[in-house]
Amino acid sequence: MCGRFSLSSNLEELQNEFSNEISGNFPAKYNISPGQSPVVISLKKNNFYLNKIHWGFRVPKLTKLVINARSETINEKPLFKNLFQQNRCLIPANSWFEWNNENK
């Protein structure tokens, strides 16, 4: 996943994509970055729910947040293995992009 994304769809637009209703509410955001709490869609007891989750993992040996995993090794790495098998979610997004620091 890229380092930034936006979500401007409203609840009605998301509900049109799913067979059962999604409960919850959220404002549009155009610059969601690691460390923030974006909205995700999770499935519990055959119902979809909107939840906010913290984006990123703190690893003691690293200064930056870990924000993504390689699909080829996600089921092998200790940090991601259990999460990948048990705690999946959908991350709704209208766009994604990498931040450019060249002019700073």
Functional labels for PLM-detected ranges:
Residues M1-K104:
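Short linear sequence motif anchored by a di-proline
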